[in-house]
């Protein structure tokens, strides 16, 4: 029997509640499909500050590095807003990404038929949307040097540097090509090559890699047009590949096609070692401990972990089908509630998901 070590990071706010739901479901599908998940919980974020004084204890990072996958719930609490920026809960996540050398962020966006009315776009525009945004996570303008603010000639100037090396583009492009090959063999690389030298390099490297993935249809799109096309005709996209800045913006735009951030999972991957899987939503401290949280993004993040991190696609399919079935039956948490549906709390939603398995 295959065995996998999974580090659970419940974190802050609603994190412990949604982690409990995901863990129950993971145990069921693991038993059904003949593998074993060995869970280890570790503190991160505000809970780690309370326990150790640090947002990312060394013991947490060590445990994550030796795991097969890491499943994170949520980080953040206004209780710590008065701390120096480097001591706040959110720096725990940044440190974890750095410590695991994660460079590829994956954001799937799929329209669930039962929730199609939740989108702000017309049904005929978003029906059938199923795309993946692949964002480079560690380079580009957020990390480029030099950067800063200076005063010269009586004027203040701020500056940042947008830079990518060929090797940085190659490794993220490889991830995107492989994902496209596992999906529908369509890859759209998004850049600003009509203006930026760094984007011209990006486009050249993507084109250079394309012959190695001959079955994948490659196209290019300027980022301003891509932002428009995501709203005008999102069905045209399968896999979107882009850099850190453009991906930061486009992934949030794509997320809102669904109408609820409470349904969106994500993954961050490196070249080696475990991936990090987490919901897109935050810690929602205003509803923490009240049994109001929506656990579905956490469950779908667990499904991504099974599919991508542990190569257990059949078990992942079970979790995704359970989510679809529960929603089709009219069960909703408060963030998804609409007329004629049945309201449920976090625990009760978990019970319905278990029944749907």
From Swiss-Prot:
Organism superkingdom: Bacteria
GO BP annotation list: L-leucine biosynthetic process
Signal peptide segment: none
Compartments where found: Cytoplasm
Keywords per UniProt: Amino-acid biosynthesis, Branched-chain amino acid biosynthesis, Cytoplasm, Leucine biosynthesis, Magnesium, Manganese, Metal-binding, NAD, Oxidoreductase
Keyword Magnesium: yes
Binding site for substrate: 97, 107, 135, 224
Cited SMART domains: Iso_dh
Chain positions recorded as NAD(+) binding sites: 282-294
One GO cellular component, as annotated: cytosol
Pathway(s) served: Amino-acid biosynthesis; L-leucine biosynthesis; L-leucine from 3-methyl-2-oxobutanoate: step 3/4
Catalytic class of the enzyme: oxidoreductase
Recorded GO MF terms: 3-isopropylmalate dehydrogenase activity; magnesium ion binding; NAD binding
Catalytic activity annotation: (2R,3S)-3-isopropylmalate + NAD(+) = 4-methyl-2-oxopentanoate + CO2 + NADH
Classification via InterPro entries: IsoCit/isopropylmalate_DH_CS, IsoPropMal-DH-like_dom, Isopropylmalate_DH
Keyword Heme: no
Task performed by this protein: Catalyzes the oxidation of 3-carboxy-2-hydroxy-4-methylpentanoate (3-isopropylmalate) to 3-carboxy-4-methyl-2-oxopentanoate. The product decarboxylates to 4-methyl-2 oxopentanoate.
Subunit structure: Homodimer.
Name of the protein in its database record: 3-isopropylmalate dehydrogenase
Organism: Synechococcus sp. (strain CC9902)
Organism placement in taxonomy: Bacteria, Bacillati, Cyanobacteriota, Cyanophyceae, Synechococcales
Name of the gene: leuB
């Amino acid at each position: 029997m295959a065995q996998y070590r999974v580090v659970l990071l419940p974190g802050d706010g609603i994190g412990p509640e949604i982690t409990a739901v995901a863990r129950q479901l993971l145990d069921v599908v693991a038993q059904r499909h003949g593998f074993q998940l060995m869970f280890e919980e570790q503190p991160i974020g505000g809970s780690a500050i309370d326990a150790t004084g640090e947002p990312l204890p060394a013991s947490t990072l060590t445990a994550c590095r030796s795991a097969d996958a890491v499943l994170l719930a949520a980080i953040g609490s206004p209780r710590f807003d008065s701390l120096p920026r480097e001591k706040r809960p959110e720096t725990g996540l940044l440190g974890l990404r750095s410590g695991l050398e994660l460079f590829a962020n994956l954001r799937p966006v799929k329209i669930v038929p039962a929730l199609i009315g939740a989108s702000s776009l017309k049904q005929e525009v978003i029906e059938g949307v199923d795309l993946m945004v692949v964002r480079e996570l560690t380079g580009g303008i957020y990390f480029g040097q030099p950067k800063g603010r200076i005063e010269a000639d009586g004027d203040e100037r701020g500056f940042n540097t947008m830079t990518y090396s060929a090797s940085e583009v190659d490794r993220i492009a490889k991830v995107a090509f492989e994902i496209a090959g596992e999906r529908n063999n369509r890859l759209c690389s998004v850049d600003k090559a009509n203006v930026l030298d760094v984007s011209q390099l990006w486009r050249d490297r993507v084109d250079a890699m394309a012959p190695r993935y001959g079955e994948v249809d490659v196209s290019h799109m300027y980022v301003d047009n891509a932002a428009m096309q995501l709203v005008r005709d999102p069905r045209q996209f399968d896999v979107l590949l882009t850099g850190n800045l453009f991906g930061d913006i486009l992934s949030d735009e794509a997320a809102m096609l669904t109408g609820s951030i409470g349904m969106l999972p994500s993954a961050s991957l490196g070249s080696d070692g475990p991936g990090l899987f987490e919901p897109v939503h935050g810690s929602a401290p205003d509803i923490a401990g009240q049994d109001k949280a929506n656990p579905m993004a956490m469950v779908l993040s667990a499904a991504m972990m099974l599919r991508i991190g542990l190569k257990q696609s059949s078990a992942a399919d079970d979790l995704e089908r359970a989510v679809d079935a529960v929603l089709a039956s009219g069960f909703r948490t408060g963030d998804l509630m609409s007329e004629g549906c049945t309201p449920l709390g976090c625990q009760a939603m978990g019970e319905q998901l278990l029944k749907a398995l």
